[in-house]
């Protein structure tokens, strides 16, 4: 029998299409429940000593790495760095030693640059702490990681849990226990409610953007963000609009907007601004 997928129709409007509330709640709570495993691994890393923590990624995982690095930059004295995997493979980093620790994430577990990266890191005698979504993949193999957690999705949350415990260990997060108690009690339900509350707005946003794009297919859409939202800005433009929908985009940081981009923004130029709540919001 021929399979015929039922296509969503615009006339259906905002309808939380493909939204599975309980699955979403379970996914976030499952990630939060990884905290004891994360703390145990960080305790071991801390005991062994390190001269640098390197969040390294490619594409979307690089975006998440940028987010966690800027989050820690203004809060911690720990030596924390962010690197693009492909750049690290070609350029390296003279500060990187056999006492460095690399933290990575991968959905597929097979990404070419990340596989090459962990091999290079191990050649230098350094350690790799990996978050991998899919079991049985290349990056889960014993020779590709030193510390491993396999759990799907919630990449930024997992990175932030690492960051928070590192800062707690360094005496920089006094409210760590209270913070986690509140997160574990509320985060999953709050995130689900955000999806519900924003669905109507998201539908109108998407509908208007598609209508504009159909009339201006050669005009790129500009995305602007800063602070811990810049990684999301970069990822949303590249991974979602370009990679998945083949729509031309450009992402730029708020701090750079007035040094070039403002000169080409006119009345009908499509621009989306990501507004965060961290130290860089004034930008």
Mark where each language-model region is.
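Long, low-complexity, Lys/Arg-enriched
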Residues: 1, 263-266, 270-275
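Active-site phosphate/pyrophosphate-binding segments
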Residues: 12-52, 146-148, 154-155, 164-252
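Glycine-rich phosphate-binding loops that contact phosphosugars or nucleotide phosphates
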Residues: 46, 51-189, 226, 274-283
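Short, solvent-exposed amphipathic alpha-helical segments in soluble enzyme
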Residues: 68-74, 119-120, 236-244, 266-267
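A short, well-structured beta->alpha microelement
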Residues: 79-91, 250-263
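Short, well-ordered secondary-structure micro-motifs
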Residues: 93, 233-236, 261-264
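Short acidic/glycine-rich loop or secondary-structure boundary segments that cap or lie
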Residues: 230-233, 259-261, 281-282
């Amino acid at each position: 029998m021929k399979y015929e997928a039922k296509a969503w129709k615009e006339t259906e409007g905002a309808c939380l299409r493909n939204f599975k509330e309980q699955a979403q709640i379970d996914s976030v709570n499952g990630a939060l429940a990884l905290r004891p495993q994360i703390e145990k691994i960080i305790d071991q890393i801390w005991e062994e000593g390190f001269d640098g923590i390197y969040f390294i990624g490619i594409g979307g995982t690089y975006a998440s790495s940028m987010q966690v690095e800027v989050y820690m930059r203004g809060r911690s004295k720990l030596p924390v760095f962010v690197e693009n995997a492909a750049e690290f493979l070609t350029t390296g980093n003279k500060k990187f030693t056999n006492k460095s620790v690399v933290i990575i994430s991968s959905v597929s577990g097979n990404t070419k640059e990340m596989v090459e990266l962990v091999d290079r890191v191990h050649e230098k005698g350094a350690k790799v702490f990996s978050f991998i979504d899919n079991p049985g993949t290349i990056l889960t193999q014993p020779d590709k990681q030193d510390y491993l957690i396999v759990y799907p999705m919630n990449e930024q949350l997992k990175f932030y849990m690492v960051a928070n415990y590192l800062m707690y260990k360094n005496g920089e997060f006094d409210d760590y226990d209270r913070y986690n108690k509140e997160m574990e009690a509320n985060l999953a339900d709050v995130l689900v409610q955000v999806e519900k509350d924003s669905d109507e707005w998201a539908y109108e946003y998407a509908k208007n953007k598609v209508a504009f794009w159909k009339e201006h297919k050669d005009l790129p859409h500009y995305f602007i963000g800063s602070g811990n939202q810049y990684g999301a800005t970069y990822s949303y433009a590249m991974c979602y609009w370009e990679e998945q929908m083949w729509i031309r985009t450009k992402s730029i940081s708020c701090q750079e907007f007035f040094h070039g981009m403002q000169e080409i923004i006119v009345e009908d130029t499509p621009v989306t601004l990501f507004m965060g709540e961290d130290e860089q919001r004034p930008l």
